[in-house]
Swiss-Prot record:
Known function: Endonuclease that specifically degrades the RNA of RNA-DNA hybrids.
PANTHER family linked to this entry: RIBONUCLEASE H2 SUBUNIT A (PTHR10954), RIBONUCLEASE HII (PTHR10954:SF18)
Any Pfam family: RNase_HII
Domain annotation RNase H type-2: ranges: 12-201
Chain residues that bind a divalent metal cation: 18-19, 110
Naturally occurring in which organism (per UniProt): Pseudomonas paraeruginosa (strain DSM 24068 / PA7)
Lineage: Bacteria, Pseudomonadati, Pseudomonadota, Gammaproteobacteria, Pseudomonadales
GO molecular function: manganese ion binding; RNA binding; RNA-DNA hybrid ribonuclease activity
Cofactor remark: Manganese or magnesium. Binds 1 divalent metal ion per monomer in the absence of substrate. May bind a second metal ion after substrate binding.
Family: Belongs to the RNase HII family.
Main location, first listed in the record: cytoplasm
Subcellular location: Cytoplasm
Protein name: Ribonuclease HII
A single cellular component GO annotation: ribonuclease H2 complex
The protein's required cofactors: Mn(2+); Mg(2+)
C-alpha cells in the first residue's frame, strides 16, 4: 500500500503546478496545473516518481474526475530549442495556469522559481512530495508525457522511447549515434548538438 500525502492540507482555490520532461533529449516539456476540491478527497497522492505506473494511471483518472479544475500544457521541441529549457518550462507552466477553468487565488509552483502569472504565486522546493495539489499536477504531467512518448516510439522506432521516455540512457545514446536525430530531438541539448556538429565536419 503506497501511502499518500495528507489530503487535509488541501486549501480552497490553490493550484499546484509541476512539470515533467526537462531532462530528456527529445519530446516536449509537459506541465500541469491542478486545483483540488477539499470536499472530494483523493487518497494516495504523492510525487509521481514515487508511484508505480499502474498507481499513476489510476490516480490520473481520479484527479481529472474529482479536481475542481485541471489543465495539461506543454512547450514544443522548437520552443525548447529557441528559448532554452528553463524558459520553455516557465512558458508551459504559464499555459497550464492560464488554461484552468477556475481562477486560483494562489499558484504553488514545484521548484525554486515561478513563471510570470496573473495570479499570486510561490515556489515550493520538493513541492511534489509535500503539497497534494502539486503531487496531483506531477501525476497528470507525467502520465500525459509518458503516453505521448509511447506514441512517438511508434512514429520513430528503434530509439526505445517507450522505455526511456527520451531520457539520455545508454540505449538512447547508442540509437542516436547509430540512427541520427529525429525531428523531435532537441537540437540545443549537448548530445544531439554534438552529433549534428560532427556530421557537418
Amino acid at each position: 500500500m503506497q501511502l499518500g500525502l495528507d489530503f487535509n492540507l488541501v486549501e480552497d482555490l490553490v493550484a499546484g503546478v509541476d512539470e515533467v520532461g526537462r531532462g530528456p533529449l527529445c519530446g516536449p516539456v509537459v506541465t500541469a496545473a491542478v486545483i483540488l476540491d477539499p470536499s472530494r478527497p483523493i487518497l494516495g497522492l504523492n510525487d509521481s516518481k514515487k508511484l508505480s505506473e499502474a498507481r499513476r494511471e489510476a490516480l490520473f483518472e481520479e484527479i481529472r474526475e474529482k479536481a475542481l479544475a485541471w489543465c495539461v500544457a506543454r512547450a514544443e521541441v522548437e520552443e525548447i530549442d529557441r528559448l532554452n529549457i528553463l524558459h520553455a518550462t516557465m512558458l508551459a507552466m504559464q499555459r497550464a495556469v492560464e488554461g484552468l477553468s477556475v481562477t486560483p487565488r494562489l499558484a504553488l509552483i514545484d521548484g525554486n522559481r515561478c513563471p510570470r502569472l496573473a495570479v499570486p504565486s510561490a515556489p515550493v522546493v520538493k513541492g511534489d512530495s509535500q503539497v497534494p495539489a502539486i503531487a496531483a499536477a506531477s501525476i497528470l504531467a507525467k502520465v500525459s508525457r509518458d503516453r505521448e512518448m509511447v506514441e512517438l516510439d511508434r512514429l520513430y522506432p528503434g530509439y526505445g522511447m517507450a522505455g526511456h521516455k527520451g531520457y539520455p540512457t545508454a540505449v538512447h545514446l547508442e540509437a542516436l549515434s547509430r540512427l541520427g536525430p529525429t525531428p523531435i530531438h532537441r537540437r540545443s541539448f549537448a548530445p544531439v548538438r554534438e552529433l549534428l556538429d560532427a556530421s557537418v565536419e
